[in-house]
Amino acid sequence: MAKRSGSGLQSSAGLMRYYEADKNAVHIQPKTVLIVGALAGIAVLFLSAVNGFWP
């Protein structure tokens, strides 16, 4: 059987492109997402209580 040549180069080229695109992406810490979500929930509860929509 003949060996395949060149198959490793194509797969590593795709990984390099993905890695380079990932370095340029915006990174948000999970703690930040949780804090923003909690603040948004508290704001909704507060505004609904102030406006008389409390269940």
Curated annotation (Swiss-Prot):
GO terms for cellular component: plasma membrane. It is found in: Cell membrane. It holds the Pfam family Sec61_beta. It is a single-pass membrane protein. GO terms for biological process: protein transport. InterPro entries: Preprot_translocase_SecG, SecG/Sec61-beta/Sbh. The chain crosses the membrane at residues 30-49. Keywords: Cell membrane, Membrane, Protein transport, Translocation, Transmembrane, Transmembrane helix, Transport. Residues 50-55 are extracellular. Residues 1-29 are cytoplasmic. HAMAP family: SecG (MF_00751). Belongs to the SEC61-beta family. Component of the protein translocase complex. Heterotrimer consisting of alpha (SecY), beta (SecG) and gamma (SecE) subunits. Can form oligomers of the heterotrimer. Involved in protein export. The function of the beta subunit is unknown, but it may be involved in stabilization of the trimeric complex. This is Preprotein translocase subunit SecG. The gene is secG.
